[in-house]
Amino acid sequence: MPDPSDLSRHTPMMQQYLRIKAEHPDRLLFYRMGDFYELFFEDARRAARLLDLTLTSRGESGGERVAMAGIPYHAVDGYLARLIRLGESVAICEQVGDPATSKGPVERKVVRIVTPGTVTDEALLEERRDNLLAAVARDGAVFGLAVLDLSGGRFTLQQPGSVAQLLNELERLNPAEILVSEDEPLTEELSGRRGLTRRPPWHFDPESGRRQLLSQFGTQDLAGFGCEHLGLAIGAAGCLLQYLRDTQRSALPHIRSIRAETGTEYIGLDAASRRNLELDWHPSGRAEFTLLGLLDRTGSAMGGRLLRRWLHQPLRDRTTLMLRQQAIGELLADRRFEALHDLLRGVGDVERIAARIALKSARPRDLSTLRQTLKALPALRETLHGTESALLGELTGRLVDQPELSELLQRAIVDDPPQLIRDGGVIAEGYHAELDELRLLSENADRFLAELEEKEREHTGLGALKVGYNRVQGFYIELPRSQADRAPVHYIRRQTLKNAERYVTPELKAFEDKVLSARERALSCEKALYEALLEILGRWLPALQDCAAGLAELDVLANLAERADRLNWVAPRLVDAPGIRIIGGRHPVVEQVGGTPFVPNDLAFGPNRRMLVITGPNMGGKSTYMRQAAIIVLMAHIGSHVPAAEAEIGPIDRIYTRIGASDDLAGGRSTFMVEMTETANILNNATAESLVLMDEIGRGTSTFDGLSLAWASAEHLARETRAYTLFATHYFELTALAEECEDVGNVHLDAVEHGDKVVFLHAVREGPASQSYGLQVAALAGVPQTVIDNARRKLEQLERQARSAHQQAAPVAQLDLFLPPEPHPVVRRLESLDVDGLSPREALNLLFELKQSL
């Protein structure tokens, strides 16, 4: 890229380009030239690589070949969407001057900046996923995290107390863009993220942030938001607001509040647990294999986004959960959910439309969609009439009619508007008299000219008179040369031809001025009227946002009612007493996508039963049994019904899972290291109110090492943490833990042998398993029979050796790792003593001897 400080060697157009580019060094600059957006120099090379564009060159400027690539202006949204997904930011530079009056390059300026976290255009967003902008400030080990959804207006603050907590929150939120200070060294996990944007350190100043928040919300302090003590997070929030003002170049009236989060109000879910429970992601990439894929039948996009947020932040507040349960129960009782579900399918994305109105970027079809949604409100309220649920009553109260707004939209916007205001034809006829006249002129020019020609023939008596038009002379009256001397005095000669004279009259000149610019003036008038309309619509922003929130929550509740009805789920009981009791529990996703009938199973945890050691065959269903327990608990804490015959759930603070593992090649961590990192997180952070799933701990190392770690981890969870723990293992030795810890029980997944085959019953039974059926599973997987036969011979050999070792070690019952240590000679001497036969003197002498031998 040429040095912008020395522009004298460049052409005037390149000078203009380089000056504008210097203001946006880290963004791709889309520079409008006619019907294309052009990119030059390094921007062109980068865009060509990212978008698979043809890279060309256009002569030289300043002694350097000008690399260039172009994008048609009418296709820009598709290219922007691809760049945003890649984490790129774009500055869009438009022609704002008039080419006809410009001396030198037409005046241009950046009119729009698009970044991953500030996108609001419908075409650039995933409709059912939040698009978040985050800012991170740091002071030692404490972080300030501010997160804003520009397209929805939600604004939150928190202060994670460690790098691990910060990364866990970022994993949950998955922001499209993260703002960090230019002088902040990044962790390895942060530095690899897309959409990372550096900002000046002073943008994170807490006092500056406080002033910006007070200005944004029009308050004198932040006490009402509960965040005055979160200095670091306030600094991060100030950085967000400044960044939005820099990029949006407009006020942000839809950002009306901010909420402080402590984390204690939600069930804790770390990144591993979200991944292992497959909430909204599956390794196959198939959405139908995820919990969200099964749950989401919402009618509106904003309902879908809210459901996703609920899944990732299950609540601990039982009052809110019971309100949701009661609402779902009432919708089920009289099947109102069916009518609601149908009505909500016609509801638009009012949340994002309101944000675009606030940012003055709403498109014509946004307004027609809003108009249709407002028309649906009376039917929704009528459907909810008479409900007793407090929550449904509150949501109904948010669906307020806006007759003035509805009337304005009906009067201002045509029934089926084009996508863009620049296309014209958006403002309805009758809304503005001048616009109607301009359109009439443009549309009826031919009729006017025919009428003028007839009128002039009558007035002059010249039958050969014609009224015509060409692009050079404009409109004219033409007379044959033979009749030119009879032209009226008010005719002004415009052009002389070989056989004719052409004239213009004041009336024709006035018409020409109107018609030639009528289209341009109509478009200009329409654009001004549309911008004024958006300004007027801003008055209804609070009401629209409140309505959107009500519609979204109503959509989720109706959706959960439909799922409960369709999939035969029940309302769980949320109780104060510790424990988890599930009768006939089912894994909701496996039940629906599996090819065979699902076998329900029970689970019982209580004050005196805190851990189940689960053994059984491979493919027997251990992981499914564990996951379904966690999913049922999670679903109960979003207010949903659950897949079970009965469920009773006591207080839960966190859900941890350690299920499956793979190498973290990018992070340089082996499978075993990943497993141990996740295990350490659980052992260090789980509490007596946590639900813990541990699957096959220790399998990534040697047998004795793995068994030792598995035993110690299970014992720590059982004795020290006392978390509700499902501990699946192939180490049969772990079943002995139940004999040492009264809170530990054994269960197994049942299977039966039929010849050389094994049939998995998937039923959970009390007690440990008898064997793992590994050879049978290998045969099912297609391992060659010769290998299976060889493995069976080796197994028999190993079992004979184990029996022999067991007999030699008798009467010790425990094998391998847990054989008791060889007793000390002093212990053996004491065990052989006849205490009753010793005299006092002999006892003292013996005690002295024993002391000497230690």
From Swiss-Prot:
GO terms for cellular component: cytosol. ATP binds at residues 616-623. It comes from the Bacteria. One of its GO terms (molecular function) is damaged DNA binding. The keyword Acyltransferase does not apply. Pfam families: MutS_I (PF01624), MutS_II (PF05188), MutS_III (PF05192), MutS_IV (PF05190), MutS_V (PF00488). Transmembrane segments: none annotated. Gene3D superfamilies: 1.10.1420.10, 6.10.140.430, DNA repair protein MutS, domain I, MutS, connector domain, P-loop containing nucleotide triphosphate hydrolases. GO terms for biological process: mismatch repair. Keywords: ATP-binding, DNA damage, DNA repair, DNA-binding, Nucleotide-binding. PANTHER family: DNA MISMATCH REPAIR PROTEIN MSH1, MITOCHONDRIAL, DNA MISMATCH REPAIR PROTEIN MUTS FAMILY MEMBER. Belongs to the DNA mismatch repair MutS family. This protein is involved in the repair of mismatches in DNA. It is possible that it carries out the mismatch recognition step. This protein has a weak ATPase activity. NCBIfam families: mutS1, PRK05399.1. This is DNA mismatch repair protein MutS. The lineage of its organism: Bacteria, Pseudomonadati, Pseudomonadota, Gammaproteobacteria, Methylococcales.
